[in-house]
C-alpha cells in the first residue's frame, strides 16, 4: 500500500491518453522531451474504446448481415442470424488489440505512463490520485502541460443513463441483444449511424430530432440522400420534435416528445438511445488552480499553436473551442502542441480538415461548401458526379449519392468537397490532399484514376466543374 504524496518531475505532462494525448506524448518523446502521460481509464480514449472503433466494428457486422439477407437480385438467397454476443466479443477483441498497441507504442517511444486522475495544484504541478482508497497519490511538477481530456456524452432532462431502458451511445455499443423497438433521440451523426446499424440488425427504429432535418451542419441535399435510405430501411423519422420524457409500460416503455407548438406525441419502445452530442471534460481537473478558465460550455480557448492563456499549458481535441470534435483533429493538434514544445515552428491549419459519417450511404466532407466560398469572397465553380453514372458504384449495388467539388473560378484552386455515397469516408482523403497541396481542378481532372473505381467519380466531378465531363452532363 502506498501512503502519502510522492513528488516527481517531468518536462512535459500530457493529461489524457486519447487520440490527442497519446499522439502528443509519442511525438514529444520522439523529439527528445521527457514526457509523462496520465490516463485514468483506458489507453486510446473514447474514440478507441467507446466510440469510433467499436462503432465501426458494429457497423461492419450489421452491414454484412444486411447485405447477405438482401441480395436476392444477384441470385443470393440467405437468412443470416446475428449472434450479438459473438459480434460484441469480436468487436471487443479489435478494441483490445488496439488499446494494447497504444500502450506498447508509448512505452517503446520512451513515454512514462501513469495511471490516475490529475488535478491541478498550480500552474506547474498536478496531483495524481491513483485508483481507489489507500492506493496513494503523487505530485508531478512540469515545465509544459497538454490537456487532452476529451469529452463526455450529454445527458438531457428526463433521461438518466443510470436507468436500464435509457442508453447512451456507449451502452448501445455494449448491447448483447437487439431491442425489438428502439427510439433514438437525436438525428446527428452518432444518432444516424446507430439508427442505421440497429435497423440493419433487425430493430424497429424511430428517430426523434428537434430540428427540421437530420445531420445538422451538413448540406440539405447530402442529408436528403441519407434520410431517403434510412426510410427505405424502415426507420421512422420524426423531425421538429424534442424528447421530453419516458415512462414504463407493461410491454416496454413509452417515449414522449413535444413539438415547438406544444403538441405531444408518444412512441413505444424497449430501449431509448440518447445521442444529442458531447461536452468537454474540463470540470474535473481544478483548472482554475492553474489560472485557466473555460467558457460557459466548458471549452478552452487556444491559439494556433494550441496554447491556452497560460502559455506553457496547451489544450487539444474535444476540449478546444471552435474546432470539430474529431479524433484526427485531436491527433493533429497533439502533434502541433508537442512539436511547439520541442521548439518547432508549427501551427494548426484547419482549412483541410475532412470529416466522415458512417451512415448508409457514407458522408465525407472537407473545406468549403459553395455557400462558404461565396461568403469568403470567392466566385465558386462547382462540379458534381452522380454515383449512378459510375460503373464501379453500380457493380457494388450501392449507387446513391454524388461527389461534389467546389473551386475558385478565377484560380481553379480546390476549396472544398462534399461526398455522399459508397466509401465516401475513404474518397474524401484525395480532396483533403488536394486542398492541402494547393491543387487546382485541372490537377485533379488530369490525374489518371484507376478504372473501374469509385475514385473516378472524384476526377469526373473536377472535369464537370471544368465543363469537360465525359460520363455526366456538364453543368
Curated annotation (Swiss-Prot):
It catalyses: N(6)-[(R)-dihydrolipoyl]-L-lysyl-[protein] + NAD(+) = N(6)-[(R)-lipoyl]-L-lysyl-[protein] + NADH + H(+). NAD(+) binds at residues 186-190, 209, 275-278. FAD binds at residues 39-47, 56, 118, 318, 327. One of its GO terms (molecular function) is flavin adenine dinucleotide binding. Its cofactor is FAD. GO terms for biological process: 2-oxoglutarate metabolic process. Its EC number is 1.8.1.4. It is an enzyme of class 1 (oxidoreductase). Disulfide bonds join 47-52. One of its GO terms (cellular component) is cytoplasm. It comes from the Archaea. PROSITE patterns: PYRIDINE_REDOX_1. Keywords: Cytoplasm, Disulfide bond, FAD, Flavoprotein, NAD, Oxidoreductase, Redox-active center. PANTHER family: DIHYDROLIPOYL DEHYDROGENASE (PTHR22912:SF160), DISULFIDE OXIDOREDUCTASE (PTHR22912). NCBIfam families: lipoamide_DH. The active site is a redox-active disulfide bond. Belongs to the class-I pyridine nucleotide-disulfide oxidoreductase family. This is Dihydrolipoyl dehydrogenase. It comes from Haloferax volcanii (strain ATCC 29605 / DSM 3757 / JCM 8879 / NBRC 14742 / NCIMB 2012 / VKM B-1768 / DS2) (Halobacterium volcanii).
